[in-house]
Amino acid sequence: GTWSDDTSMTLCLADSLSRGLNYNDIMQNFLKWFKKGEFTPFGSAFDIGNTTRQALKRLEQGAAPLECGGNTEYDNGNGSLMRILPLLFYLQSVYGREFYQEDEAFAVIHKVSALTHAHKRSQIACGIYIAVAGMLLGEMNLKEAVNLGIGKAMEYYQNQEGFVEELKFYNRLKDKDFADLPSESIRSGGYVVSTLEAAIWCLLNTENYKDCVLKAVNLGSDTDTVAAVAGGLAGLKYGYTAIPQDWLGVIVKREYIESLCNQFYFAITR
């Protein structure tokens, strides 16, 4: 029932967004997590990624929050993708259910990624993920929602200078037979493209929350992050009540997490 950096950084973002969108405030929460062990199950930060660590070091050295993120090809780990989901609810509260029609909404996604991961490839992963997540809250069937979310994000990026060159890395997601790929061809390491692919593949190949998360874990490699990213989507599709009670019962600091989530919900819906 313990949890790692994925959950901690997601809670950091949700807590900060409760007070509105402030990039410095988000980074200060990340620092509180890394330096003081806040937003953790046992009072100390666990398993921080290298790109995130470097970004926080730059912040401490005086860099502006939006100048901290790594922007080289080697900075495309899954560290911004794994924490981005709370932003969906903020964007819907500001721009409405069709936030993906707004360039400004994508700009916010990219900036929240860029706090730690500023390369266009990581930003695209976050954009696709948030677009798919938004569609899962609608009435469409699973496959339709996923395809429409991917399609809307691709549509946006195809017209964006600097991003269009990176789209080729996401070609497999556009393939109508993507869900039918065998598990051996799904990579589940720390590379952001692999993590996004694995999460969507697990979602498309299962029919409930529990099976989706277990499939992600069973892919091996970066299991906590792939399961967190896949579980985020499955949670939106199947709802809170679909999470197995025996899993919820053993979560460390469950009341703390639920209270922070409630605070976030009330802040963005008031």
Label each region the model flagged:
Residues 1-270:
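Structured, active/binding-site neighborhoods that engage oxygen-rich ligands
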